[in-house]
Regions:
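Acidic, aromatic-enriched beta-alpha/helix-loop junctions
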Residues: 58-106
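Generic structural motif
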Residues: 44-46, 59, 86-88, 136, ...
């Protein structure tokens, strides 16, 4: 295993947001004889929810498979998501409480039209914050593994909602 660094595009932030990324990046070679698929596990923080650690796992195809399929600019667009608390979980007053949630980040999985996304949903009644990972693609015909129908969730109990936490854009 080795540490790797990747750039995630956090919504509302123009930089690579290194302050939200943790140093617990892992890259593991999995299936394949010589050129193997790579399982990546990354840890990151939600900038609007203190005390939560999110873990995202996804796969990267080897360059030989990309060349053989003639699709060198894309990777699978499905991921696993887990979360844990690292202390008191506090939801910022600026976090959206709308039913459609708020996008935490989006990562491009091809040159154009395909991305892996994580959204946050605040459940004030259930005193929880829920995260969902899903893929988004423009061309629904080229989806051989039905990744557009796959998602993953995790939830963490909230200790405090900061006052003024109204529906924000």
């Amino acid at each position: 295993m080795q540490r790797v660094s990747r750039s995630l595009n956090y919504i509302g932030h123009s930089s690579t947001c290194a302050q939200y990324l943790r140093d617990a990046f892992v890259q593991v070679q999995t299936s394949g004889l010589v050129f193997k698929d790579t399982l990546r596990v990354e840890a990151f923080d939600d900038p609007k929810v203190a005390g939560v650690q999110l873990y995202l796992s996804d796969f990267q195809r080897p360059v030989t498979e990309k060349l053989a399929k003639g699709d060198v600019f894309s990777d699978p667009s499905q991921g696993g998501l887990g979360c844990s608390y690292r202390g008191k979980v506090v939801v910022s007053a600026t976090a959206s409480t709308k039913p459609d949630g708020e996008q935490v980040f989006s990562e491009s999985r091809s040159l154009i039209f395909k991305s892996l996304n994580v959204r946050r949903f605040v459940d004030k009644e259930g005193e929880s914050v829920v995260y969902a990972v899903y893929s988004q693609r423009l061309d629904k015909n080229e989806d051989s593994n039905n990744s557009r129908f796959k998602s993953n969730l995790c939830a963490v109990h909230v200790d405090e909602f900061q006052s003024g936490a109204a529906a924000a854009p």
